[in-house]
Amino acid sequence: MENWSVPEDDRPYIRPARSFNPWLAVAAIGALAWALAFYFRTWLEPTPPAPPPASAVEAPAAPAAEPAIRHPLEAAGDAPATLPSLENSDSMMRDSVSRLIGGKAFADMVVPYQLVRRIVATVDNLPRRTAATRAMPLNAVPGGFAAVTNGEQTAVDTVNYRRYVPYVNVVAAIDAPALVRGYVRLYPLFQRAYEELGFPGKYFNDRLMEAIDDLLETPELDAPAKLLRPRVLFEFADPDLEMRSAGQKILLRIGPENAARVKEKLWEVRRELLAASGRR
C-alpha cells in the first residue's frame, strides 16, 4: 500500500459537501449587523428629507453573460438509436474501451464495472484539491511509492517514474480522434452520470475541458520534488505544489518525461473536442 495517497471517499459518486468557509460566516455576520443597525436607525432617528432626484445617467451596459454551455457537442450521426441505462452500460463501455486500448491493457489496468460513473467522477475530481481513489476507473499501479533521503532532505525517488510507464504507453498509443468519436457517440450516458453525481443543469463536456486545461497547466520541475512527511502520508515541501489540484499532483508524481507524453496526448484530445464542438 502506498504512503502517498489522496483521501478516499467510501461514497465516491455523491457530490462532496462544500467545506466550511470562515469568510462566508464573517460576511453573513456583517450583513446581519448592517441590517440590524439599519432597522434601529430608522426607528430611533428622524428620517432625513429625501434628496432631490439625481439627473438621469445612463447605466453602463452589463457585461455579456457567459454562455450556459461553452463546449456543446452535436449528436454523432452514428450514435446508437437508444442507449442503455447507466446500470446496464458496462457491457457497451467495456467493448468500447477494450477496442480503444487493447484487451490485455483493459484487463490489466481498468476497473470493469460502473465505468461511466467512475470516469465522470474522476474527471470532476481532477481539478479539485483531492480525488477519491475508489472512484477512479484504473487499478492501482503495482509497487510502492519510494522516497530518497539525503541528510535532512527527502525527495521523490526517480525509480517511481518507471512504475507508470506501462500506463503512459497505453495513453500515448490512444487514437485521439477515435477516442473523441466514441465519447461523442456515448455522450448522453456521461451527461446522465454527471447530473446524477449532483450537477443537474451542468454540462459534463465543459467540466471535461476544465479538467484537461487544468492538467495542461501542471508545472514542469527541473528536479525531483522535495517532500515532507508530517504524519503518515508524504506531502510536497513546496507549498505551491502542495496546493495544486489532484490532477496536477498526479502528473507531478509520474515524472517529467511521463507527464510530457500525457500532456502531448491531452493536447490532441483537446483539439478533437474543440472540433467536435464546432471550434478550432
Tell me the role of every PLM-derived stretch:
Residues 1-18:
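N-terminal, positively charged topogenic segments adjacent to a membrane insertion site
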Residues 17-27:
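N-terminal Sec-pathway targeting helices
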Residues 25-37:
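Hydrophobic membrane-insertion alpha-helices, especially the h-region
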Residues 34, 223-280:
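A cross-kingdom marker for long, charged
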Residues 34, 46-151:
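N-terminal Sec/ER secretory leader and immediately downstream segment
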Residues 92-106, 160-173, 242-248:
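Acidic/histidine-rich, surface-exposed loop or edge segments in extracytoplasmic proteins
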Residues 109-112, 130-138, 178-183, 194-208, ...:
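Surface-exposed patches in mature extracellular/periplasmic domains of secreted proteins
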Residues 144-206:
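Mid-length scaffold segments of soluble, non-membrane domains
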